């Protein structure tokens, strides 16, 4: 067998078989859009990569958490919003154990370390600290994020799933306010192995900034429309963090000669959780070649196990049969790949719609039609939650609720770009 181009037989392991014997936590599948192509011409093949989190950490015991809650307590959070956040924080504390590490930072004009990073051995005392959180004045997001980063990185990160959850209801109004400085902080935390998730509360925060924080930090972006949604948002984050089976995951590609990867692909992956699947759609351009079975792509995922502290690897090959038949490239496309391509188109349409609304480039009729079309496409491809979000955004558009509309659509776009399914609802 030619290890670089031609395959005289299929590899001796199926796609998705982990590349290392000590890597049961992750699997990788490579699904080609079409398994045949015309040998005599240049061809384009879509390949759907599925990174699957399987099983549980070793012995079924979850990985300890190193969790930091960074909470906005500016004046606009006074009343029901801050009360709901306090209750959600106490609910988080109740689910942690003595092997977990928790820190809590609040910010307004000034920053307070409510709880320095420590093991959760006295949840009642921690809850009492949380009850003392009261509203202040302005919003110093930069310093709050910095202080949270200091806490979460003050303990050895090996052996923990480290996560920082940021919640704010407004724009930065004190301290450093420029997005570039804020995102540099997040980038540094991510490089140290800390996942940063961002929650925006109410109608007044900058949704694009919060989504960028989550994207840079490898975490989740959540839009919380009202106080009644706070508890569920915190629970989703906690459940996901408790289910992590692989961290620091990176997607890698090996392309044999005469094959090229089209477009840009984000190779940094979010933490992989048990029961979740992360999808990435790539396009391979192949030049003319002789007939036979060829590998057009070898993909692998390198990660780290927070449970065993050992490296993980999973790999898979994309295989195409090149035949001397002009119609070989017109075979029906794999349904899963077709669905992934449909999702990609839906995301592009949604981004176009959002930008058009912001610049008032589309009429109300055009916007409604575009949103309805995107909703239908999402429903057809099984993304029921995202379809419901677009339906909610459509109602907001029709009633003139621009803030809710934009924040909802940014959240939907973020979820589609993340490409993750399964896990906590």
PLM features per residue range, with description:
Residues 2, 20, 29-248, 287-290, ...:
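Exposed acidic/Ser/Thr-rich ligand/metal-binding surfaces
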Residues 27-29, 257-267:
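Short beta-strand and strand-turn-strand segments in soluble, beta-rich domains
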Residues 286-425:
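Long, acidic serine/threonine- and proline-rich intrinsically disordered regions
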Residues 245, 249-250, 254-257:
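Membrane-embedded alpha-helical bundles of multi-pass transporters/translocases
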Residues 273-292:
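Low-complexity, intrinsically disordered segments enriched in Ser/Thr together with acidic residues
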Residues 48-50, 282, 299-302:
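OB-fold and OB-like beta-barrel modules that bind single-stranded nucleic acids
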Residues 35-36, 267-272:
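Beta-strand-rich interaction surfaces with strong enrichment in secreted/lumenal proteins
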